[in-house]
Amino acid sequence: MIVPPIKSQGIKTKLVPWINDVIDSSGLNLDDAQWIEPFFGTGVVGLNAPVKGHHIVGDTNPHIICFYEGMKNGSINPFSVREYLEREGKLLLTSKEDGYVHFREVRDRFNQEHSPYDFLFLSRAGFNGMMRFNRHGDWNIPFCKKPNRFTPAYITKICNQVASSSRVIHSG
């Protein structure tokens, strides 16, 4: 199963086998079928869909779309993600208030610049894997209070998720 790099509460990972069983038993020609998903979210369902034809995805969250568009055009890749997370992880680990000062810096930067890398960081460093925005569209989730969040193993896991998701995106 492809696990997406974006972390979010309520991810449908456990439903993917059931959804795919329903699709597989539908009798449709999956080689020519289209996959249309208006609420892509983290992408776990779409990235694992058995449909081989054209995929059309959307979401009301422009940051999700921007992140996956970056993966599609190659500007977001395992190497750039590793470089970013290693740098930001070190800053988080050495930041005052057990990392909270740096978390706020990234959050404030994201709210101004909307970087897909900052979006990924916040989805992984935010409390309980939640994703929420206030009425102004600003990130509105507190820090998970784990300054050592971005260990080498965790960064590798995220980079592997970027790589496997990218392969699916580029195969269609």
Predicted regions and their residues:
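S-adenosyl-L-methionine
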Residues: 1-39, 44-45
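Class I S-adenosyl-L-methionine-dependent methyltransferase module
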Residues: 52-169
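Aromatic pocket-lining residues of Rossmann-like dinucleotide-binding sites
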Residues: 49
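A conserved short coil-to-beta-strand element within the FAD-binding core of flavoproteins
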Residues: 172
